[in-house]
């Protein structure tokens, strides 16, 4: 018994000694959980700080993009964007028959004329459009666009405007821009189905102008409206960026409805509307209009008209000036369903024109047409219309905004998109244009039947090959007939108009290689 007590005492003493040597007891489970939770909180906060830093860096880093729609630099929040785009068109014009109207021009500019007073239409290569574009958006709603033109041997500004999108139903555009008038004109130059636009667009309705316009979309984007106040241009005119010379403004208005837009209906591709312009136009006098070309700014307020092959077939007399009201009206429509597309337009212009005393000397130089001749003011009415049809053989959907091939061209894997196009377009000039103010003589008129035709009618057919969304090869064949003048030769028209002959027909083959991005 004594031995057991002694042994227990020894063991107890040893255990106590070891416990004292081991130090304080282990931490409780609660303490360890608290320490672990604290470490997790620290790591979580570090992760949050890293994410915040990454988000801050992301918000301040611009996004660079490159693709088939161009090149862009965009702020991280998408509120500020600048884009670089371009349009290049290389054309060839081949004339099987036709005339280049250079009559009534100085020898220095025209050279020697044939027995009929014409040069044959000249075959040529040309750069039709060379247009780099800088466009973008500031603060998410202020769009801008700047497009110069380097084709034609000189530089000019095509577009230069700001478009403030305050609301889909209320936008304000200011600067130089396409007038909200012609349907075909509002189609991009890269998306038009033919190499050249119709007589409605190129001859009657305005091209670009300088001013301000309010526009927008109503009724769920089913009704588009536009009202503008612009400087005003002659028929088919493209205003320069300089100051206006006559101080009068032109009012433009357009309503266009797409009532079945976004509906699952065969009519969802139908659009129709009407546009108009009005001004009181006063042309400048004492200018040498005879020596001007169709590309010159006709500051007499009156236009020259081009045939489908881009040769002048009508010009006013050098003594004629715009002198009063000018009203244009244009009903218009399009229809797209599947691969089929149709555009139809009509336009009429009513222009007050007067004759002036004198005119440019035969040898050129400053004119003496400084005074309006009394009782010569006359309202002349010209009109034009067109119907154009397109059909995509490869089954893509036709649209107002161009074609995107189902398959890009690649040997062995795809042939792009193929499209057939056909158009009939004509323009008719007021009979009174070619008579004197009394209406009894063909001499002393507002235009001369020996150099100008009364009407032009063009049949155009062609094919478009879209290699991809950016590249197109186009081929057009155009046949234009002229009625009532411009074929009389070098002899002036007589008072009775008995020696009027029609201008020779124009047969032209036009080709184009286009790159747009």
Where are these regions (language model features)?
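Outer membrane beta-barrel
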Residues: 69-282, 381-413, 417-435
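Helix-centric, low-specificity signal for extended rod-like, repetitive segments
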Residues: 25, 34-39, 122, 190, ...
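Intrinsically disordered, low-complexity regions of eukaryotic proteins
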Residues: 22-23, 28, 39-41, 93, ...
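Bacterial N-terminal signal peptides that target proteins for export
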Residues: 1-3
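Outer-membrane beta-barrel pore domains
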Residues: 118-119, 266-268, 276, 284-517
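N-terminal periplasmic/intermembrane-space "pro-region" immediately following the signal or transit peptide
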Residues: 6-7, 13-89, 95-107, 112, ...
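Residue-level detection of beta-strand scaffold positions
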Residues: 40, 51, 80-82, 169-170, ...
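A short catalytic or substrate-binding loop motif that flags glycine-/basic-rich loops and adjacent residues
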Residues: 64-65, 205, 324-325
């Amino acid at each position: 018994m004594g031995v057991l007590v002694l042994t227990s005492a020894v063991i107890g003493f040893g255990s106590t000694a070891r416990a004292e040597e081991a130090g304080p007891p282990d931490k409780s489970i609660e303490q360890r959980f608290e320490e672990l939770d604290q470490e997790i909180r620290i790591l979580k906060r570090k992760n949050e700080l890293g994410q915040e830093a990454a988000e801050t860096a992301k918000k301040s880093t611009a996004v660079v993009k490159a693709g088939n729609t161009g090149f862009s630099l965009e702020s991280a929040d998408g509120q500020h964007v600048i884009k670089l785009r371009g349009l290049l068109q290389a054309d060839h014009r081949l004339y099987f028959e036709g005339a280049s109207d250079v009559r009534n021009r100085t020898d220095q500019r025209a050279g020697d004329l044939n027995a009929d007073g014409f040069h044959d239409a000249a075959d040529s290569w040309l750069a039709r459009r060379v247009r780099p574009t800088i466009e973008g958006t500031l603060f998410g709603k202020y769009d801008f666009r700047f497009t110069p033109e380097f084709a034609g041997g000189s530089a000019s500004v095509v577009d230069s405007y700001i478009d403030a999108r305050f609301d889909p139903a209320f936008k304000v555009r200011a600067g130089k821009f396409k007038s909200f008038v012609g349907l075909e004109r509002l189609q991009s130059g890269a998306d038009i189905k033919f190499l050249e636009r119709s007589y409605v667009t190129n001859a009657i309705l305005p091209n670009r102008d300088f001013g301000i316009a309010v526009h927008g979309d109503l009724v769920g984007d089913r009704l588009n409206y536009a009202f503008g106040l612009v400087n005003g241009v002659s028929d088919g005119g493209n205003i320069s960026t300089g100051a206006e010379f006559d101080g009068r403004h032109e009012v433009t208005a357009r309503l266009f409805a797409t009532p079945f837009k976004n509906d699952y209906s065969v009519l969802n591709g139908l659009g129709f509307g009407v546009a108009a312009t009005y001004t009181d136009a006063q042309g400048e006098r004492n200018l040498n209009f005879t020596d001007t070309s169709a590309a010159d700014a006709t500051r007499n307020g009156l236009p020259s008209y081009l045939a489908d092959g881009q040769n002048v077939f009508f010009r006013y007399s050098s003594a004629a000036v715009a002198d009063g009201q000018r009203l244009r009206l244009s009903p218009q429509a399009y229809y797209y369903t599947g691969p089929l597309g149709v555009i139809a337009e009509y336009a009429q212009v009513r222009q007050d024109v007067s004759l002036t005393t004198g005119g440019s000397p035969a040898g050129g130089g400053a004119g003496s047409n400084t005074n309006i001749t009394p009782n010569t003011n006359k309202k002349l009415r010209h009109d034009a219309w067109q119907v154009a049809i397109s059909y995509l053989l490869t089954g893509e959907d036709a649209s107002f905004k161009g074609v995107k091939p189902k398959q890009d061209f690649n040997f062995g894997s795809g042939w792009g998109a193929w499209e057939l196009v056909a158009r009939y377009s004509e323009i008719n000039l007021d009979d009174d244009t070619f008579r004197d103010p009394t209406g009894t003589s063909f001499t002393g008129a507002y235009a001369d039947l020996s150099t100008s035709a009364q009407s032009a009618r063009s049949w155009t057919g062609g094919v478009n090959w879209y290699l991809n969304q950016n590249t197109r090869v186009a081929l057009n064949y155009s046949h234009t007939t002229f009625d009532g003048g411009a074929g009389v030769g070098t002899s002036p028209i007589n008072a009775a108009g008995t020696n009027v002959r029609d201008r020779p027909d124009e047969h032209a083959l036009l080709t184009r290689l286009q790159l747009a991005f």
